[in-house]
Regions:
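Tryptophan (W) side chains
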Residues: 40-43
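P-loop NTPase switch module centered on the Walker A-proximal segment
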Residues: 46-154, 158-160, 209
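P-loop NTPase catalytic nucleotide-binding module
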Residues: 47-69, 88, 155-248
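Residue-identity detector for glycine
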Residues: 28, 33, 46-47
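Cysteine-centered motifs
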Residues: 12-14, 21
């Protein structure tokens, strides 16, 4: 059912208690295993209380893609930009909020689907960080059954992989709205153009870039908003200013 995530993990801690979400109602589980409802259906996250949102202001978005393409890193960046965390973790360091399980931190990849709630403007987005390796495909299927839309992550360095196509097929099966997000654009070997060409070859006119990267001296310095035909230059990790669109 839409807007309902059943038995999905939430990567936040409330007084050292693991918080889970069942039928969209926050439930705490203390060390003795006793369940308790959090007051007013709110939970504490980093000292802040997250408000209750009506269903029309809630979106469940699944993050899909091949193993190692950057899904968890993207989710971590979303949490940082929206203020859920004040420090961005790294998969390599085993300190991301979605891969909090000891086994995940040890293996450096996701084993189960994790729910990371973020707030963007007046909408609550339940981001579902799914595993990329086929051994855990059941976790992906469950996330997609609860999702309103999906983001398929593709590495600009590795390009389109088997997991990319599997993710598309899973979305097609459910007629789920989807978009692609290209990662690793700060890598010298990344090629946004090659990714777009390969996706277009596979899926035809369904592929339409909304943004195009700006590179100078082999560095990723900004992007072009294709819809608005406006250039953007990065100033900090999550900030940018308007700039000229390169002639190339």
């Amino acid at each position: 059912r839409k807007n309902i995530v059943q038995f999905a993990k939430i990567s936040c801690v409330c007084h050292e208690n693991l918080v889970q979400c069942i039928h969209n109602i926050p439930i705490g589980v203390n060390k003795s295993g006793v369940e308790f409802l959090l007051p007013w259906f709110m939970w504490q996250n980093g000292g802040r209380y997250m408000d209750v949102y009506k269903y029309e202001k809630i979106r469940n978005v699944a993050i899909l893609g091949h193993g190692g393409c950057g899904k968890t890193t993207l989710v971590e960046a979303m949490a940082y930009v929206t203020g859920v965390v004040n420090r961005q973790g790294r998969v390599e360091d085993g300190n991301t909020i979605s891969d909090y399980d000891k086994e995940e931190a040890k293996r450096l990849f996701s084993i189960s689907t994790t729910l990371v709630p973020v707030i963007w403007e007046d909408t609550k987005i339940n981001v579902l960080d799914t595993p990329g390796y086929f051994d855990f495909v059941g976790e992906v299927e469950e996330a997609l059954d609860a999702a309103d839309a999906a983001v398929i992550v593709v590495s600009g360095k590795s390009g389109v992989e088997v997991g990319t196509m599997k993710a598309w097929e899973a979305c097609e099966k459910r007629k789920l709205p989807r978009m692609f997000f290209v990662t690793d654009m700060d890598d010298d070997n990344a090629s946004f153009r090659k990714v777009v060409e390969d996706l277009t070859e596979l899926y035809g006119k369904k592929i339409a870039p909304f943004h195009s990267p700006i590179r100078e001296n082999e560095k990723f310095v900004g992007f072009v908003n294709v819809i608005k035909m406006a250039g953007r230059r990065f100033t900090k990790l999550s900030d940018y200013v308007e700039g000229e669109i390169p002639e190339y």
